[in-house]
Amino acid sequence: MGQVELVRAGINYLSDGGCFTLMTGILARDPIASATVAAFANGAIESFTLAAAIDLPRGIRINTVSPSVLVEATSYHPSFPGYHQVKAVDVADAYVKSIMGKQSGQIYKLD
């Protein structure tokens, strides 16, 4: 759970009112075959985001960006038949919203 450790260690270095933006994916809410551990990890990060938003000190915020499979990640398309594909630029916009906005504890889902 490297992202959790990043937050735990980073609290001491992030400015007051700063923001952590983590990343998960579609597997947290719509898993595929042979991806049980990945689905578990995605769900755990999303739950961590919700809980940490309550406890983070000094106005520090935390959000997670959670896209479906990317249009540009063509090697993954066969594993996600029927899934809506999202553009990388849309994922980037979600990061901007997280970092520049004021919300905390959000899961920005791009399906």
What are these regions (language model features)?
Residues 1-6, 11-56, 66-71:
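Catalytic loop of short-chain dehydrogenase/reductase
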Residues 57-60, 64-111:
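C-terminal helical subdomain
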